[in-house]
């Protein structure tokens, strides 16, 4: 079980890497990673079968019961967790009102055949995908996913 490490400098390599991942176009794809923000998306990330690279959290981000449950699970899974100040977190966050938790996750690498699993025959309905890029409000992702599911979208590409 790993402890939560405190980072106090914006020049720390983890902070610089995460900032570049979130704010430099193409960096996340190049690294095979992506970031999600907010308690709800963090809960979804922890309950998924996707690998978590590392977590940034503020003191405020650890205050809720839901967040403490998340951190217990993350610590048990030996995920690196870094505590940062609100000011450092705001430089990385893309939301107007950050909740104080950001998870960097590994992308699942899929080859072209994966998307073609939904091949169709003449007369059948073609598969339909939604691609999401640089979502401003992480709460919008869950809304988009629920809507996509309701209308029968074949998949969502993050």
Feature locations, PLM:
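Boundary-proximal intrinsically disordered activation/regulatory segments immediately upstream
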Residues: 1-72
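Residue-level recognition of specific faces of alpha-helices
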Residues: 17-20, 91, 131-134
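Short beta-strand segments
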Residues: 36-37, 58, 104-106, 133
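RNA substrate-binding interface of SAM-dependent RNA methyltransferases
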Residues: 47, 73, 82, 87, ...
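Short connector loops at helix/strand junctions that flank enzyme active sites
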Residues: 50, 96-98, 125-127
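A short acidic, glycine/proline-enriched capping/turn motif at secondary-structure boundaries
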Residues: 61-63, 87-91, 98, 108-111
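Glycine/small-residue-rich loop that forms an oxyanion/phosphate-binding "nest" at active or ligand-binding sites
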Residues: 71-101
């Amino acid at each position: 079980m790993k402890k939560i490490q405190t980072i106090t400098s914006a020049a720390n390599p983890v902070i610089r890497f995460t900032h570049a991942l979130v704010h430099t176009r193409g960096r996340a794809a190049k690294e095979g990673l992506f970031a999600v923000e907010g308690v709800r998306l963090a809960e979804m990330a922890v309950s998924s079968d996707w690998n978590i690279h590392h977590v940034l959290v503020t003191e405020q981000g650890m205050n809720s019961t839901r967040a403490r449950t998340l951190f217990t699970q993350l610590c048990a899974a030996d995920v690196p967790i870094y505590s940062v100040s609100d000011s450092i977190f705001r430089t990385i966050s893309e939301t107007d009102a950050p909740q104080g938790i950001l998870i960097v996750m590994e992308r699942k690498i899929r080859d072209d055949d994966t998307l073609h699993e939904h091949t169709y025959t003449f007369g059948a309905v073609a598969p339909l995908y939604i691609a999401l890029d640089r979502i401003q409000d992480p709460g919008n992702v869950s809304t988009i996913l629920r809507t996509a599911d309701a209308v029968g979208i074949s998949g969502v590409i993050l």
